[in-house]
Amino acid sequence: MSSKKRKDAEVAQARVEITPDLDVEELEGVGRVTGAKLKERGFFTVRDVAFASVKELAEIVGNEERAQQIVEAARKMLGLHSFVSALEVYERRKKIRRISTGVRALDELLGGGIETRAVTEVAGEFGSGKTQLCHQLAVMVQLPEERGGLGAKAIYIDTENTFRPERIMQIAKARGLDPDQALNNIFYARAYSSDHQMILVDQAKSIIRQHNVALLIVDSVIAHFRSEFPGRENLAERQQKLNKHVADLLRLADAYDVAVVITNQVMAQPDVFFGNPLRPAGGNILAHGATYRLWLRKSKENIRIAKIFDSPYHPEGEVSFRITEEGLVD
């Protein structure tokens, strides 16, 4: 890359990195009244608008033409309105941050840990260790970078009432953190329905803007959707709603440089006679929505097996780890 092109790329990237907190009213064509309407619906910053869909904004500002102009202005301000070279994408990916799982073998399987700007799905049966991993990640993100963390806070959305602060304290103590402070660094909310779950994700944006948050956990992403939309007759409506939820999570991860971890339940395939009859719930929506997909399963005693079964660049592979009083360990 020539020095001029490299400088242009650096300027564009710098613009992306320094603009996220610009108030939405800084945008051309957005005055106080429109700004108030956008903020009421969760669009506080230029970056919020840049990652929104035109249809989404049209419902707020009144028509698609004006919404298109506002979205384009936001993307232009962030340098997101044009193509870039693959080399520039590669340079940006070098700046991706990772959170250690606390299990060396699992980190190696994931290429260094859980990535920011991505959605990582963790699927498995009841008792396979999904929630245990979520608890551990909520602690690990708080560690300094030299110890595998990001020196940051976490947001934990609990849909099945499985979050246990006592477990956080155990893991924190084992990792040399003050247990009370570790709990104080986790923003927790219980989601009571799929609508509430989606509202909480919108509210999470405000917390991320105001605090040093680098991890958002949704445990589990599918539970309310399955219980509220039973039967084939409701499947299309469920998947449409789930699709919006997953898209919101992907946008949030990319817009705010946070790691999003979602857990997923499993379902049986009655027509499978050989191999594993179980598959992750959520169908193609979750299959295409998650950036990385992990499958956890039980082995003997307290041993669990983690397999990466879908990734843009990781090869398939599996590793084992143990669940102990101190957390997940090799």
Swiss-Prot record:
GO biological process: DNA recombination; DNA repair
Keyword ATP-binding on entry: yes
Cited InterPro entries: AAA+_ATPase, DNA_recomb/repair_Rad51_C, DNA_recomb/repair_RadA, DNA_recomb/repair_RecA-like, DNA_repair_Rad51/TF_NusA_a-hlx, P-loop_NTPase, RecA_ATP-bd, RecA_monomer-monomer_interface
GO MF term set: ATP binding; ATP hydrolysis activity; ATP-dependent DNA damage sensor activity; damaged DNA binding
Sorted UniProt keywords: ATP-binding, DNA damage, DNA recombination, DNA-binding, Nucleotide-binding
CDD domains: archRadA
The keyword ATP-binding belongs to this UniProt entry's keyword annotation: yes
Residues binding ATP: 124-131
Family: Belongs to the eukaryotic RecA-like protein family.
Family matches, as PANTHER family: MEIOTIC RECOMBINATION PROTEIN DMC1_LIM15 HOMOLOG, RECA/RAD51/RADA DNA STRAND-PAIRING FAMILY MEMBER
Function text: Involved in DNA repair and in homologous recombination. Binds and assemble on single-stranded DNA to form a nucleoprotein filament. Hydrolyzes ATP in a ssDNA-dependent manner and promotes DNA strand exchange between homologous DNA molecules.
Xref: NCBIfam families: PRK04301.1, recomb_radA
Stated name of the protein: DNA repair and recombination protein RadA
Organism this protein belongs to: Pyrobaculum islandicum (strain DSM 4184 / JCM 9189 / GEO3)
